[in-house]
């Protein structure tokens, strides 16, 4: 019927939005955007925490008819994307080696099996070793791999662990931690 649309074939979780995949419901309002006529606000680090009102105006609608939505810039567009392809395992000496592949939010073109360029000032990561929702240890790294040693496990848990859960973050000099990649081993 008039004014109703059925959306199908949508690609979700693109360009670092996977954390929002499950946040929409049937019957929810949406704005259909096309590249032509779309203006993206240029909000840099100085705009983080600033609240502004925005209106979405379509063909046949005037600015005065559109409802304003308040938005506070959280800097999420500046956060590094979550790493992907987390891998690893427990070694014979009880150390855990965990590795991953970084993603880029800037200059993301695939170049014949070569990693995307680091889109941050420096390549830096933090890996949280978890116990439920409690962070037991944070390990920093400047490469996409860490070793969680047997000695660290004994300090953190009182014994070597047969399973672990990690949250991996790439870091930004501007906004700190990016989005987490979580995995249980």
Q: What is each model feature region?
A:
Residues 1-185:
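Interface-prone segments of viral and bacterial extracellular assemblies
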């Amino acid at each position: 019927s008039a004014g109703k649309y059925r959306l199908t074939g949508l690609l979700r979780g693109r360009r670092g939005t996977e954390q929002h995949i499950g946040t929409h419901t049937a019957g929810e309002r949406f704005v259909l955007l096309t590249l032509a006529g779309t203006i993206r606000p240029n909000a840099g680090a100085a705009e983080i925490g600033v609240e502004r009102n925005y209106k979405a105006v379509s063909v046949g609608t005037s600015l005065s008819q559109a409802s304003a939505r308040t938005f506070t810039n959280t800097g999420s567009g500046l956060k590094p994307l979550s790493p992907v392809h987390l891998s690893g395992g427990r070694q014979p000496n009880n150390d855990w080696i965990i590795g991953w592949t970084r993603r880029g939010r800037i200059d993301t073109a695939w170049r014949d099996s070569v990693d995307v360029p680091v889109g941050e000032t420096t390549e830096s990561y933090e890996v949280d070793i978890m116990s439920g929702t409690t962070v037991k240890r944070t390990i920093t790294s400047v490469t996409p791999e860490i070793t969680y040693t047997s000695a660290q496990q004994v300090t953190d848990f009182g014994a070597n662990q047969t399973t672990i859960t990690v949250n991996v973050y790439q870091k930004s000099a501007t906004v700190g931690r990016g989005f987490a990649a979580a995995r249980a081993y």
